[in-house]
Amino acid sequence: MPQESAFVPLLLALQDIPYGDFAYKLIPTLSRERIIGVRLPALRKAAKELTKQQPEEVARFLHTLPHCYHEENLLHGFLIEQVKTFDKAIAYTEAFLPHIDNWAVCDTFSPKLFQKHPKETYTHILQWLKSPQPYTIRYGIGLLLSNYLDDYFDSEMLSLVASIQSDEYYVNMMIAWYFATALAKQYEATLPLIQSQTLSSFVQNKTIQKARESRRISQEVKDFLLQYKLPTI
């Protein structure tokens, strides 16, 4: 097991055991022993304070992977969000992604610098989508969902995500989430893909399910999408 970092005592001081029990139920890929139980607002606050008060220790922490505890990984992501330059933020992210082992860490950190440098970030996303690591792929799709379905949208992104072939549940769920959000934000561009029924039955049907659960999609469209569900084996 990796050595505990210097920040573990701080995390233990913020421990909320019932919250840890709750988090464990949501993250079946982790053992309970790896979850301290710290709420996200407390972790974000700690990341901001540590960046200001202990920059050298933060730098050491960001260069030391892997970590022991789930909350160390969450803190790692939030510390990357505090980095002031794009080059450092992307370098730290590149180093961190292979060590992400669950959806919760994957989905909770997203440096604002990536939004300010969409073209540069996109070149990295293209590589992440080709990764053998499922959570690296999921992270790349997640950035396309959050940062590239409005002003920076390009229809080629739909094709890129559609081309991803994976047996990983957490990859396919993110693909479905992406296309459901794309239906809400870029309906005209996304609908032909759903109509083509070329996605796997799991992704196709989950996309339609999530779209039908969305408050941003009209009831008329929700009913219309039902005809494109695929039979499951």
Predicted feature descriptions by range:
Residues 1-233:
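Alpha-helical scaffold domains
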